Amino acid sequence: NGIAQARAIQLRPELAAPAKPVKKPAKPEPESSAINAANGETNTADANKNGSDSQPPIIKPIAEKVPNNLDISKYAYDPATESCNADMMMVGDSVTSGTSDAIQAAFPNAFIDGLPNRQLPQAVDVYQQDTAAGHSGSVVVFGLGTNGVISNEQEVQQLIDLTGGKPTYFITIRMPYPWQENNNNTMLREAAKKNKNVGIIDWHGYSEGHSEYLNDDGIHPNMTGAYAYATMI
C-alpha cells in the first residue's frame, strides 16, 4: 500500500509476494503499489536466517520513481486496519476529494485537501495556506492535472520548490483525452527526473485495463476505484 505496503513487507516478509487486497465493498485486483518491490526483489535472506520478527527484512520501497530521501523506517503499518501512521499531506483536485475517505482510512494521520476543478497552478496558494495553518506532512503528495493542460514544467517546479526538499510524489492522471493525459503525465515525469526528492505514483498504469475502477466519465474513481487508489498510495 504505497508507503504503508513497504513497511508492511518489512514486518511480514510474506507480503513481498504479489498480494490480493482485502475485500472492501468491491474488491479491486491491484497490479502494483506505489511503494512496493519494483522488480519483486526484497532483501529477505538475512532476516529469515535469524527467524525473528524483531529483525524485519530490509526492502527497497519503489514507485515508478521513488524520492531518494524517503525513509520508510519512520512509518508503521497495521495489517489489521490496513492503515499507516505516515503523516502525509496531500493536495489535489476532484479525484483526491472523491477518494479522500478511502485515503484517510489508509492514512489516519494524513491531511487531505482535495477540491473539484482545482488546477495545478492553483495548488501553489493552497499548499502555502495549508502549511501556514499547520498542516505540514513529512511526505507530500500532489494529485493534480485533470482540470486543464499543464503549460510548462515550471508550474510543476513551483510546487516542488514549495515542499522544501521533502519527499514528494505526483500521481499520474487517467483521462479519456489522450492529448491532455499524455501532456500532463509527461510534464510530471520530466519534473521528477530533475528532482531527486520527487517520485511518481502511476495511477494511469495502475488503472490500465480496470474500467471497473472508474465512473462513466472515465476520470473519477468509483467506490471500488477509490479503494484501489488508496491501496496504490
Residue ranges, per PLM feature:
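Conserved beta-strand termini and adjacent loop/short-helix elements that scaffold enzyme active sites
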Residues: 113-115, 171, 201-206
